[in-house]
């Protein structure tokens, strides 16, 4: 089995810059996440762009949906910012083929920070792509959600059933 991993950036991919005191994007952490996870399946990785999901627009979402639609690999993980992940999932559902298992995930803290949830969420999404039926899913906080039955609770900082 092959797994495709697309990254769009989001907090998952950000790195703390000690000079500016800001979080910003550098090189993708996903190759290191895959290596540290000791994954033995074939993984095809592709960077789509590096954006905070609050800065994504409809064209970005349509581009993600198009890349998924034309991707020959049927099991796909999408790394995405958490603020608009549900919105992008709906766009994918509307515009991409429904014969693939697409699992979106992200992180509340960057992978580069020790207490991050990034590795856990990636592992959950990676395994979910191998076990779920075709559709658009979100894997966050140890749960798997259907894309049309989930919301981010910004007060608690977790994803919940809608």
Where are these regions (language model features)?
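Active-site histidine-anchored catalytic micro-motif
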Residues: 1-162
């Amino acid at each position: 089995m092959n797994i495709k991993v697309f990254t769009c950036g989001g907090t998952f991919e950000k790195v703390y810059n000690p000079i500016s005191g800001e979080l910003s994007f550098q090189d993708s952490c996903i190759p290191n996440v895959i290596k540290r996870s000791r994954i033995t399946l074939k993984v095809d990785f592709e960077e789509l762009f590096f954006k905070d999901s609050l800065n994504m627009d409809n064209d970005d979402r349509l581009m993600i949906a198009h890349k998924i639609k034309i991707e020959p690999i049927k099991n796909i993980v999408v790394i995405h910012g958490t603020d608009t992940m549900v919105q992008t999932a709906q766009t994918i559902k509307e515009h991409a083929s429904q014969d693939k298992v697409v699992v979106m995930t992200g992180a509340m803290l960057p992978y580069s920070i020790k207490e991050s949830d990034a590795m856990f969420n990636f592992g959950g999404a990676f395994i979910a792509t191998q076990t779920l039926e075709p559709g658009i899913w979100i894997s966050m906080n140890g749960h798997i959600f259907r894309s049309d039955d989930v919301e981010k609770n910004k007060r608690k900082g977790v994803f919940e059933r809608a």
